[in-house]
């Protein structure tokens, strides 16, 4: 499996480069995140949500990657001001190696709520 898009996506995420992140996602990407009530479908739907997140998050630090035949999972840390949380992203890749499905899992819950509150105040 070609992971060039995954590596470029994570580098863009660490730079907080929205366009760079989106360029490594399939047009029909599906995002499931604790920061939205339902699944977001397509790059146009993701853009404002991810842009808002990048405005409030200070850093993403990737710690470990796990790989299967058509997916990659990443364990990482997130810092937003004095808030720190752990995250796991599950990325299902298409044949071109673009991310076509992304499921975001964050913990602990109080930190997730605090980041969501920061997003609400920033909008």
Model-predicted regions and their roles:
Residues 1-123:
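C-terminal and inter-domain tail/linker signature
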């Amino acid at each position: 499996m070609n992971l060039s898009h995954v590596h470029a996506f994570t580098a863009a995420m660490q730079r907080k480069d929205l366009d760079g992140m989106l360029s490594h996602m399939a047009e029909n990407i599906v995002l499931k995140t604790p920061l939205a009530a339902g699944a977001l479908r397509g790059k146009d739907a993701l853009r404002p949500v991810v842009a808002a997140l990048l405005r409030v998050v200070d850093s993403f630090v990737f710690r470990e990657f796990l790989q299967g035949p058509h997916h990659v999972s990443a364990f990482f840390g997130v810092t937003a001001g004095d808030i720190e949380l752990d995250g796991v992203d599950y990325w299902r890749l298409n044949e071109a190696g673009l991310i076509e499905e992304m499921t975001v899992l964050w913990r602990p819950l109080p930190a997730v709520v605090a980041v969501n509150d920061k997003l609400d105040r920033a909008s």
